[in-house]
Amino acid sequence: MASYQVRLINKKQDIDTTIEIDEETTILDGAEENGIELPFSCHSGSCSSCVGKVVEGEVDQSDQIFLDDEQMGKGFALLCVTYPRSNCTIKTHQEPYLA
């Protein structure tokens, strides 16, 4: 099973940390396992509480049902159903910017 280095960043929240997450663990679960508290609500990809923005790298969020193609094209990802597919950098706490 492959594992990837996932860098989580957010200046306002004073977050800049890199954690290792395997390809079968969501980014939200990987963060929680490493003691990083990120916002969430449904844990099923049907709301926007956990939305982040992929700055660099590849992810799989095919299980999500909330974001439209335009939002995903801008890099937004629901971290509760997003799996790393490469080393990546993700801005956390992005719900206010989703509009």
Curated annotation (Swiss-Prot):
Record's miscellaneous remark: This ferredoxin is expressed by heterocysts and differs from the ferredoxin expressed in vegetative cells.
Cofactors (names): [2Fe-2S] cluster
State the UniProt keywords alphabetically: 2Fe-2S, Electron transport, Heterocyst, Iron, Iron-sulfur, Metal-binding, Nitrogen fixation, Transport
A GO molecular function term, named singly, is: metal ion binding
The answer to whether the entry has keyword Iron-sulfur is: yes
Q: What is this protein called?
A: Ferredoxin, heterocyst
Q: Which family does it belong to?
A: Belongs to the 2Fe2S plant-type ferredoxin family.
Q: What job does the chain carry out?
A: Ferredoxins are iron-sulfur proteins that transfer electrons in a wide variety of metabolic reactions. Donates electrons to the nitrogenase.
Residue ranges of every copy of the 2Fe-2S ferredoxin-type domain listed in the record: 4-96
The entry marks the following residues as binding [2Fe-2S] cluster, namely C42, C47, C50, C80
**CDD domains, sorted:** fer2 (cd00207)
Tell me what gene encodes this.
fdxH
Report the co-factor binding details.
Answer: Binds 1 [2Fe-2S] cluster.
Q: Top-down, what is the taxonomic lineage of the species of origin? A: Bacteria, Bacillati, Cyanobacteriota, Cyanophyceae, Nostocales
Alphabetized NCBIfam families for the sequence:
fdx_plant
Single biological process term from Gene Ontology: heterocyst development
